[in-house]
Structures are given as structure tokens and as C-alpha cells.
């Protein structure tokens, strides 16, 4: 643990000097507090809805970042370190109920290509765990998994797969974090949803569906649910759909993840 803390301190200093910590790589105001890298957590975790204290928890002497890494999300973080270190194939990831897309990030030094961070996506004072891509994140800031605490236990709320991908979004004007969910049922049926986390679950704020099976000549629909049933959605033209999708993709936000190469 001492070795990890020393490495973390060095890494934090480098990030502070070169990039500034905890902000998306898009332009973000300096007072943005929605994202905090694993190296930056210096305040104690909130006591509201905190994991049930055990004797081991009470005696824990690490700082907040260590607590979330070593206790709260220990298993979720560790399993990706194991998989990346051993360079599992897609099937092994799926067998362990993990994102198979991580298997596409082994170029060069695999442990440098994937990392994790903590964010308070729903503003309740409890950090969610985000595991995502570092490699090529400026072009495709893919999120592999998002974990939240629900009833004091870690619960997976998002996982990218071969036909569905998640991305973090940051709306600078509103100082608001959200999540984009891109899903495909094939070339004739696909959608992009914009989500807000609340009480450990995602709520749809808006979505755009392309469904040529429902209407080949006018396949675009605005939706506010994820049931894929466009009969209760609003038909829109292609120009409107393109505008909504462009606005959503323009605020995709790459994170300054703590790389797994520095995890151990």
C-alpha cells in the first residue's frame, strides 16, 4: 500500500503539472467538481448511504481514494487488472460478466491503455466507479463499466458490449454530467439515449431511434423511454435527428483515468 501511495503521489504531481486533474479533456471550467481521478480524492467519503461499517471498515487508516479502491470497489477494480494483465480474449471477459471490448486495447502496454476513476454522477456525495479506455480516448472515449452503490452494495449500472456502448458527457453551460448509451439492433434499428443517474438507476432524458422496420420512409423518432416501441414515440425528420445526435456527441468527455499500470 505504501508503494502505491508513493506512486500515486508522483502520478498526481505529473498530472497537475502537465494537464490539471479531474477535468475532461474537453474544455471545462476550473471549478468543475463532477469528476475526480483516483489520485485526487482527499476528502472523506460521505457518511450518507455509506457502506455498512464493519470492524474492518472502522479500523481502516487509508485516505478516501484508498478506501474506495481497497474496500468499496476493490473487487470491481481488481478483476480488470487481472484480465488485462493476462490479456484475456473476449470470451473470457464475457464468461466473467465483464465488457469484452477491453480485449481490443492490448496494443503496446495494455495496462497503460485502460484505467479507472471516480465520479459523483448523481450528486449524492457517493462516488461511482468508472472503468474506461485511455488509448484513443480523444477520438472514442469509451466507458467499459459504471458501478454505483445501491443499498450499500456495488451494482453495475452500465456495461459496453459489441452492440451497445456507453460514453460520459459533460454539458459545460449547465455544469452537468450525463451518460450516452448507443445501442444497435442492426442497420435498420438503432438508437442513442441520454441518461441521468438517480438512486442507482439511469433515467432517460431524451433519445433518438432509427427504426426502418416501423416506417421505412420516415424511420426517425424522438423517445423518452428505452422500450424500443416507437408506437408511443414522436416521429421526427432526419435533420432534427441529426441535430440532436450531433449535440449529444459534441459533449462526449474523455476522462483522466488512473491507469492500471500504476494500480499495483
Language-model region placement:
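Acidic/hydrophobic-patterned starts of short beta strands in beta-sheet-rich repeat architectures
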Residues: 123-133, 173-180
